[in-house]
């Protein structure tokens, strides 16, 4: 049995003073020796925390004693250690940011909830568009079979992508999904206000679908990206597959790294061998960038040799 747990949760509810709440909540979390990342806004709370089984159970009891969060659903993953290095609770304008001119309140408008078994039926329906509401790098390591991959690197870019592709989506039955459900609550609501009539969402997100005894994560390919030290977790208990591809050679890969140029920091899938071969950099410009955190530890001679091995050279100004 694992000694630790990771809790994923959210709740759209009114928090009158997010700054005071965040300060007090941080103190409570630290007292319970939790680590994680929690966002608080007037519209609610969005968090992921890790801790011992005892500590996380205590936290869930603590939240249940607050009427605002009494019915909040926690997605629970077993873990061998903390999934975060520190504990942060931050006040924000939104708990998920779509940066709309007129914000959408999921308590007033949101897509129809589909339970896991209903969502699986939608996956098999040729007349339904399954729309991934996550970022492109999340999709690339794992997604539902046949889902549409929006070309976005941030959630707030999604409405713009929808508008650019409105013709293909018009009059379609749309079902959207995300990690734990929070993004879809707001996004599906926005879709309805934007003129899309038949909009549904996976209730509880991918995390719930993967743990459902009936679906067991079936029709999910790859792993689910998570925003903590684990990076990705398995979902499909029936016939798991690898869909991630190495950025450099296209071979199957589920290992994410960040480009060593801090001004880029792009997330790419790469094997240990290719990380070394390509100096943990996504492009030539990033490899030779003066701020590169990987190459700064190499001598000029070694740097030159490593570049020559991949048919590249140092810029003249550096030579």
Curated annotation (Swiss-Prot):
GO biological process: tRNA modification
EC numbers for this chain: 1.14.-.-
Entry's Gene Ontology molecular function annotations: oxidoreductase activity, acting on paired donors, with incorporation or reduction of molecular oxygen
Active-site residues per Swiss-Prot or TrEMBL entry: 178
Pfam families membership: Rhodanese, Rhodanese_C, UPF0176_N
Key words, A-Z: Oxidoreductase, tRNA processing
Reaction equation(s) it catalyzes: uridine(34) in tRNA + AH2 + O2 = 5-hydroxyuridine(34) in tRNA + A + H2O
Occurrences of domain Rhodanese (ranges): 124-218
InterPro entries xrefs: Rhodanese-like_dom (IPR001763), Rhodanese-like_dom_sf (IPR036873), Rhodanese_C (IPR022111), TrhO (IPR020936), TRHO_N (IPR040503)
Function: Catalyzes oxygen-dependent 5-hydroxyuridine (ho5U) modification at position 34 in tRNAs.
Family: Belongs to the TrhO family.
Matching NCBIfam families: PRK00142.1-3
Protein name: tRNA uridine(34) hydroxylase
Natural source organism: Listeria monocytogenes serotype 4b (strain CLIP80459)
Underlying gene: trhO
């Amino acid at each position: 049995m694992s000694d630790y747990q990771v809790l994923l949760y959210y709740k759209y509810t009114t928090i009158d003073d997010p700054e005071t709440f965040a300060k007090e909540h941080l103190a409570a979390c630290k007292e319970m020796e939790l680590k994680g990342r929690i966002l608080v806004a007037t519209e609610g709370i969005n968090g992921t925390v890790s801790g011992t089984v005892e500590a996380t159970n205590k936290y869930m009891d603590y939240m249940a004693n607050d009427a605002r969060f009494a019915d909040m659903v926690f997605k629970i993953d077993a873990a061998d250690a903390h999934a975060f290095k520190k504990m942060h609770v931050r006040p924000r304008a939104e708990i998920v940011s779509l940066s709309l001119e007129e914000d959408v309140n999921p308590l007033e408008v949101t897509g129809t909830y589909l339970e896991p078994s209903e969502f699986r039926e939608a996956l098999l329906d040729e007349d339904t568009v399954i729309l991934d509401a996550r970022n492109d790098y999340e999709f690339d390591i794992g997604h539902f079979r046949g889902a549409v991959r929006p070309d976005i690197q941030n959630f707030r870019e999604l409405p713009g992508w929808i508008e650019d592709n409105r013709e293909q989506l018009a009059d379609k039955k749309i079902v959207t999904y995300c990690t734990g459900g929070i993004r879809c609550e707001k996004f599906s609501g926005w879709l309805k206000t934007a003129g899309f009539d038949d909009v549904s969402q996976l209730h509880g997100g991918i995390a719930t679908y993967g743990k459902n005894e009936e679906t067991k994560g079936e029709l999910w390919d790859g792993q689910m990206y998570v925003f903590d030290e684990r990076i990705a977790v398995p979902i499909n208990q029936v016939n798991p597959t690898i869909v991630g591809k190495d950025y450099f050679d296209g071979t199957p890969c589920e290992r994410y790294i960040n480009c060593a140029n801090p001004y880029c920091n792009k997330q790419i899938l790469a094997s240990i061998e290719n990380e070394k071969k390509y100096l943990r950099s996504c492009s030539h410009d990033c490899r030779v960038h003066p701020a590169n955190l990987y190459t700064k530890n190499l001598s000029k001679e070694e740097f030159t040799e490593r570049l020559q091995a991949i048919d590249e050279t140092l810029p003249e100004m550096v030579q």
